[in-house]
Amino acid sequence: REIVFWTAASSGAVMPYADRMLDRLNENGIRTAVISNLAWSGEALTERLDRLLPNNKFEFVITSSDYMYRKPSRVLFDIALNKAGLAADKVWYCGNSITADIEGAHGAGIFPVLYEGETPGDINPYSGQNDGIKVDFEYLHIHDWRELIDVLEKIPR
């Protein structure tokens, strides 16, 4: 099975404070899901997420390998909106790539959040991927999941 192969190749790791951020979202009834350009299946990613972040309440996981589209194509975002039964203007999307995530979410009418966090002592294969890329629309740029918690706590409900 692909899960066995993927786990043997890389056991995965949790980004700092991701668990705390998910707890806060859950406590506030904020719905969550995943859209990934991953080549592994949604089933494999779900297994990994459930193992590494057992507190997650992701309603669904969408991967490129399951739908044959890659972000920034709005197709994946539209599928997610349809599954969630939500209008784009009610959704925020967090990702680490300006091209795939931020431009993709914006193109689908979703508010984009760029996460560019570093894990001390680890090599981040995504470091520098956004260098020199500029966009001409509003998005939230964070470097730590605690920043998102702070922003969300300031929004009146």
Each PLM stretch: what is its role?
Residues 1-8, 41-45:
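Hydrophobic alpha-helical core bundles mediating ligand binding, dimerization, or RNAP-core interactions
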Residues 3-33:
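Short, acidic loop-to-helix structural element flanking the phosphoryl-transfer center
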Residues 19, 23-26, 33-157:
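Asp-based, Mg2+/Mn2+-dependent phosphohydrolase catalytic module
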